[in-house]
UniProtKB/Swiss-Prot annotation:
Top EC class, one word: hydrolase
A Pfam short name: Helicase_C
Reaction equations catalysed: ATP + H2O = ADP + phosphate + H(+)
Biased composition regions of type Basic residues, renumbered to the chain: 23-33
SMART domains according to UniProt: DEXDc (SM00487), HELICc (SM00490)
Chain positions with Phosphoserine modification: S533
SUPFAM superfamilies per record: P-loop containing nucleoside triphosphate hydrolases (SSF52540)
Domain Helicase ATP-binding per the UniProt entry, residue ranges: 145-324
Domain (Helicase C-terminal): residue spans on this chain: 349-500
Designated name of the protein: DEAD-box ATP-dependent RNA helicase 5
Record GO biological process: rRNA processing
Gene3D superfamilies in UniProt: P-loop containing nucleotide triphosphate hydrolases (3.40.50.300)
Gene: RH5
The organism of origin for this protein: Arabidopsis thaliana
Length: 537
């Protein structure tokens, strides 16, 4: 903590420890006034002086001062509050410095200092074998490993492509090795020790690939279970004994209810893309699955946003004082490495405009271009339309069998068919390298989904382009989209401003000091599902 400035707590509020670089960045923060209102995670109470207070007599003022002094003295005697660390971090492949905020009890302890190198983790060589191609830990790995390796419950908020799979994967492997005493080899273990929940099949497979590669040098066995494929091989693999299970909520619940999968030994649980999981209507099966794990467990949640329903789930199943690590801004923000082009047009003009854009961006038919549709039937129609126009295209959506989806994704990744049409099933979490252009044929239902869609390009420090069609039907989201564009320093077209810049107020805060802002009597939202592409069999 050398060279850092410490500010004394105000009225019992958490201690803020800031680096000099953080102070520099704060001076620059005035340029986006429209985002300032929601930018602070924790508010410092301030004296509010109204007209009545100004007229207080000297006697009343003295009494008021004494009351404040007594209150201040009481706060000093209370337990030491949670700390908050703020620092600037430059991660692997990041084009600019990004803010890292770590909150929770004991975060200022030396043992929790962010890792600058993999060697500082003091992990066994076979555990770090999967990291040898990386120069240093990414920011999310650097800041979360010290806590996770110490057994702390943790909430991680970071954009996709930040290295979060290994952020929870390496600590999960170490947890299993210690639990099963397998560092030097060990006996066969039937029931799993670690469970990773994913909202989609594609993301589950991607996580499984990473954990299988990371766990093999340590002698660990993992299995990926999801709907849309035969249960037979999955059941056989589980019965033969596994250490780590990765799966989607529907199939996991099915296997638990049929007494094939027993989670009583699971003591390390990860919820990846937690916000997406609940948004897709999986809250009830997620609760059922978590209730079947060991009561003594370490819980990890990763999410791109932190809405109220995810807060409540965390409050119920996590330690009351989890560590919270936020990489980047807590506000909805797009990747600054992506050039965002918004084109306002009539719905009927989209087909011909799409062809014109492909002739511009995909003339070589070798670079990867990802086209987003909103509905499954729309994705099917676009795939046929493009093929009829002579473009080599494939698609992934819920109406396709899992084997077809896997094949389409493989063809796109390897470059055999570098034009992919997808619904939002591919928008979150998937690591598809070298996507040069994203085209939003239909604007998504939320600006959050828009940010995640365009995040498929501009990854690992590379530049990308996102071209979006915006029609009068989307005008209700114009204000939020304008804010996203301005935050990223992008051009806001005059045609978009014609729809207005009003942003509907959200009923609850997205972020706060863990769970303090949760309203116990908040009404449960009614979910409307438009694309059930990930309903489990």
């Amino acid at each position: 903590m050398a060279g850092q400035k410490q500010e004394l707590p105000v009225s019992g509020e958490p201690l803020a420890v800031e680096s000099p670089m953080t102070n520099k960045k704060k001076k620059k923060s005035k340029k986006n006034k429209h985002t300032e209102e929601n930018h602070e995670v924790e508010e410092v109470p301030q004296e509010v002086t109204n007209g009545v207070e100004e007229e207080l007599s000297n006697k009343e003022k003295k009494k008021k001062r004494k009351r404040e002094e007594k209150e201040s003295e009481k706060n000093k005697k209370k337990d030491v509050p949670e700390k908050k660390l703020e620092a600037e971090d430059l991660g692997e492949g990041e084009s600019e410095q990004q803010k890292v905020v770590v909150t929770g009890k004991g975060v200022e302890e030396a043992k929790y200092a962010a890792l600058k190198t993999f060697a500082e983790s003091n992990l066994p060589e076979n555990v770090l074998d999967c990291c040898k191609t990386f120069e240093k830990p990414s920011p999310i790995q650097s800041h979360t490993w010290p806590f996770l390796l110490d057994g702390r419950d943790l909430i991680g908020i970071a954009k996709t492509g930040s290295g979060k799979t290994l952020a929870f994967g390496i600590p999960a492997i170490m947890h299993v090795l210690k639990k099963n005493k397998k560092i030097g080899g060990g006996s066969k273990k039937v029931n799993p020790t670690c469970l990773v929940l994913s909202p989609t099949r594609e993301l589950a497979v991607q996580i499984s690939d990473v954990l299988r590669e990371a766990g093999e040098p340590c002698g660990l066995k993992s299995i990926c279970v999801y709907g849309g494929s035969s249960k037979g091989p999955q059941i056989s693999a589980i019965r033969s004994g596994v250490d780590i299970v990765i799966g989607t909520p529907g199939r996991l619940r099915d296997l638990i209810e049929s007494n094939v999968l027993r989670l009583s030994d699971v003591s390390f649980v990860v919820l990846d893309e937690a916000d997406r999981m609940l948004d897709m209507g999986f809250e009830e099966p997620v609760r059922f699955i978590l209730s079947n794990t060991n009561k003594v467990r370490q819980m990890v949640m990763f999410s791109a946003t932190w809405p109220l329903d995810v807060h409540k789930l965390a409050q119920e199943f996590m330690d009351p004082n989890p560590i919270k690590v936020i990489i980047g801004s807590v506000d909805l923000a797009a990747n600054h490495d992506v050039m965002q082009i918004i084109e306002v047009l009539d719905e009927r003009a989209r087909d011909q405009r799409l062809i014109a854009l492909l002739e511009k961006y995909h003339k070589s038919q070798k670079n990867r271009v990802l086209v987003f549709a909103l509905y499954k039937v729309e994705a099917e129609r676009l795939e046929r339309f493009l093929q009829q126009r002579g473009w080599k295209a494939v698609s992934i959506h819920g109406n396709k069998a899992q084997s077809e989806r896997t094949r389409s994704l493989s063809l796109f990744k390897e470059g055999s068919c570098p034009l992919l049409v997808a619904t939002d099933v591919a928008a979150r979490g998937l690591d598809i390298p070298d996507v040069e252009v994203v085209i939003n044929y239909t604007f998504p239902l939320t600006t959050e989904d828009y940010v995640h869609r365009i995040g498929r390009t501009g990854r690992a420090g590379k530049k990308g382009v996102a071209h979006t069609f915006f029609t009068p039907l989307n005008k209700g989201l114009a204000g939020e989209l304008v804010n996203v564009l301005r935050e990223a320093g992008q051009v806001v077209p005059a045609d978009l401003l014609k729809f207005g810049t009003h942003v509907k107020k959200k009923e609850s805060k997205l972020y706060g000091a863990h769970f303090k802002e949760i309203a116990a009597d908040a009404p449960k939202a009614t979910k409307i599902t438009f694309d059930n592409s990930d309903d489990e069999d």
